[in-house]
């Protein structure tokens, strides 16, 4: 299992939408924003497959009644893996986690290190040639 420390950058507070089929979110889980009124906590849902998440779950779980922490996706952000990856693999959202992207799917970020299902690793930017 990958062991990494995470520096909390830009952590925000969020609750799960009442329509969520899960009871809480985990660290590095991809999340989609449902609403943000600018005056309180953000409301989120687990991200659908093959979509680009707005946030990832932080170290404090988001629940329907209790706000937890979320982070924007940035280099170094914690991401939860749903399968085996190697450093530099492009990642997509599938089954509520990040997995190695398949042809024709939306890659969100790259893996900053090797890891397996259930590991929390750091996100890395996708290299682009200008």
Regions found by a protein language model. Give the residues of each.
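Surface-exposed, low-hydrophobicity beta-strand/loop segments enriched in small/polar/acidic residues
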Residues: 1-130
